[in-house]
C-alpha cells in the first residue's frame, strides 16, 4: 500500500509539470489569453555567458537551476511581471521543474531559438542544416510547455545598412521554424524577431519581415508572427514625444501583427524610474504596442539589473526593482476581447531593394536546409574535404576557389540582393567545401583537389 501511494504521488507530480495552462494566441495585432487581451510585462532573464568563452550557454531554465528558478519566479511575479525572456538554452537538458516554477507564478517564457553557436551571423549569414537542427531541438523541447509563449528566430541580427542582407536568413529561419511546428502537429506557437532600434533600416526591416511575399516568390508562411524592438530611447523623466516613442508608434501604426518592446530600460539616468511604463500601456501606444520586456533581471557588469545576486545566492532587490513594481502596479490599459475584435491595418508591401541602404530582395529567400539533400550531394565525390577543417579555413579556401572559378561555387553561392540562392546553400560548411572542391576538380583535373591538404581524392 505504501509503495502504491508513493507511485501514485510520483505520477501526480509528473503530470503536474504538464498541467493545463492557457497558451497565448494571436489575432491581428494583439496577443490573447483565452478571450482577454494579453499585455506583456516582461523581464529579460539570462545570466551572463562566460566572459572568456562567449559560446558557453548558461541555461537558466535547466533542472540544475531549479532552486534559483523557484525563488526568481516568485520575485518576478511579485514585481508584477507575466513574461520572462530567455536568450539561450541547452535543449538536451531537462527543463520541467523550472518551467513549472514559472508556470505556477503565471509567467510565460519567450525564448530565443538561437544560441551563441547557432545564431545567424550578421556579417557572414548562413541558414544551414546545423542551425536548423539546433532550432528544431529547442522547439521539440519547449513545445510541450503551455507557458512557452513565443519563439524568437533572431535577435539584433541586422544592426546597420551594410549587413541588411542577413535579414533574408532571418525570414527563412522564421519560415522553417513555423513550418516545422506545423509539420510536427505541435500547437501553434508564434515565431518572431527582436530587432535593434536602428534608424537607417528600421522601417524596411519591419516591412521585409512581415510583408506578404507569396505573390513574389510563392514562399508561404514566412511572415514573422510578431516583431520586437530592443529600444532604449526613453531615459529618465523623458516623455512620449521627446523620447521618440511617438515617432516609433506612428511608423508602425498600420502593421497587422503584434509589436512590443523586446528590451527597454535605459540606464543613462540611475536609478531608473521607468516612467515610460505609463506611456507604453496608455492609449497613445496600446493600439500598436503589446507591452514590453525590461532589461534585465540580474545585475551584471552592464548595470541593468533589477536584482543583485550575491556569490552565496542571496537575492537583494534594487531601487530599480521597486520603481518598476510601482509603475506596473499603477497601470490599467484598455482591454480588447478576442470575440469582438475586428483587426485592422494593412500588410506592408515588401521594400524595394537598393544598393546603398537596403541591398536585399524579397523575390526569393534562402532554401530550407535539408539533411537528406545535403548528404546525398556529398556521396561518392571524387574530391571532398579532408576531415573537418575549421570554419576559418573553410572560408579561406572557398574564398580563393570561388575567385578562381565562380562556376564551381554556383550551387553553394548566395546573393540576397539578386534573390538567388544555390541548391546547396543550406548545407554545412564542410559539405559546401566538398561540393565546391569536387566541381573545381572536375574542371581543372585531379591535381587541383588538394588546396594545401584541405581536399583529398577518393579512390
UniProtKB/Swiss-Prot annotation:
Keywords: Cell wall biogenesis/degradation, Disulfide bond, Endoplasmic reticulum, Glycoprotein, Secreted, Signal, Transferase
Protein name: 1,3-beta-glucanosyltransferase gas2
Role this protein plays: Splits internally a 1,3-beta-glucan molecule and transfers the newly generated reducing end (the donor) to the non-reducing end of another 1,3-beta-glucan molecule (the acceptor) forming a 1,3-beta linkage, resulting in the elongation of 1,3-beta-glucan chains in the cell wall.
Residues holding (1,3-beta-D-glucosyl)n 2: 156, 197, 202
Active site residues according to the UniProt entry: 156, 263
Signal peptide residue numbers: 1-19
Phylogenetic placement of the source organism: Eukaryota, Fungi, Dikarya, Ascomycota, Taphrinomycotina
GO biological process, any: fungal-type cell wall (1->3)-beta-D-glucan biosynthetic process
Similarity comment: family membership: Belongs to the glycosyl hydrolase 72 family.
UniProt-annotated glycosylation sites, renumbered to this chain: 34, 68, 90, 104, 146, 160, 212, 218, 254, 284, 308, 334, 344, 354, 370, 423
UniProt-listed InterPro entries: Glucanosyltransferase, Glycoside_hydrolase_SF, X8
Gene Ontology molecular function: any one: 1,3-beta-glucanosyltransferase activity
Species the sequence originates in: Schizosaccharomyces pombe (strain 972 / ATCC 24843)
Superkingdom, taxonomy of origin: Eukaryota
Statement: the UniProt record of this protein carries the keyword Oxidoreductase: no
GO CC aspect terms: cell periphery; cell septum edging; cell tip; endoplasmic reticulum lumen; external side of plasma membrane; extracellular region; fungal-type cell wall; primary cell septum
Subcellular location: Endoplasmic reticulum lumen; Secreted
Top-level EC class as recorded in UniProt: transferase
Annotated EC: 2.4.1.-
Gene: gas2
Pfam assignment, any one: X8
Disulfide bonds: 69-98, 211-350, 235-266, 374-427, 383-449, 402-409
Residues that, per the record, bind (1,3-beta-D-glucosyl)n 1: 87, 155, 295
